[in-house]
Design a protein with these regions (language model features):
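Active-site mouth of glycoside hydrolases
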Residues: 1-139, 143-149, 154-160
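Aromatic/acidic polysaccharide-binding cleft in carbohydrate-active enzymes
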Residues: 165-189
């Protein structure tokens, strides 16, 4: 189990999501979450979130990322910590609806190490950096961060044939999760 604590932090992703409670309740809720799930051997990875708007440093995102990772380690240091980090481009759904290839967009959209510069401080507290739809950055990022362990934290099932050979070839990429190949009720909120 890739056990994700929060779908939103202090900045809303959708109306009615957890962001309205995050600042007041994150510590209490995270503690209850970890204590509830840590006895389960199926939990292999803790996640502080997925596609968090604060990933580029907004709303004290860098310091919150570190605080969350440290809080998890204080409760359970036996499992690695990650976060599913995506690009900064917000028009992805419209682009994909037009039938265009997402990985082509990512290559064009994220140039000159912009993603790396803005997310490096966000990833500093993580044991494994989750890459959502960013497999084109694996090799380049490995050159910039040779000690970084990477994970395809969210990718399309139809593209696993392209992505899995990267997992097999690149020893610093430890796996790939597809979105979605299981029952899913929808975004929180």
């Amino acid at each position: 189990v890739f056990d994700e604590a929060f779908d939103a932090w202090g900045m809303a992703k959708r109306g009615g999501d957890y962001s309205q409670f995050f600042d007041a309740d994150w510590e209490k809720d995270l503690t209850a979450f970890i204590k509830r799930d840590r006895p389960h051997p199926s939990v292999i990875l803790w996640s502080t979130g997925n596609e968090i708007p604060e990933r580029g440093g907004l709303n004290n995102g860098y310091s919150m990322a570190t605080r969350l990772a440290n809080a998890i380690r204080d409760l359970d240091a036996s499992r690695p910590i990650t976060n599913g980090i995506c690009s900064f481009w917000s028009g992805l759904d419209d682009y994909m609806a037009e039938g265009k290839n997402q990985s082509q967009n990512v290559s064009d959209d994220i140039t000159e190490n912009v993603w790396e510069r803005y997310t490096e401080a966000f990833t500093n507290g993580l044991d494994i950096v989750g890459y959502n739809y960013l497999e084109d950055l694996y090799e380049r990022d490995h050159k910039m961060f040779p000690e970084r362990v990477m994970l395809g934290s969210e990718n399309f099932p139809k593209e696993i044939g392209y992505r899995w050979p990267l997992v097999e070839r690149l020893p610093y990429v430890i796996g790939d999760f597809t979105w979605t190949a299981w029952d899913y009720l929808g975004e929180a909120g």
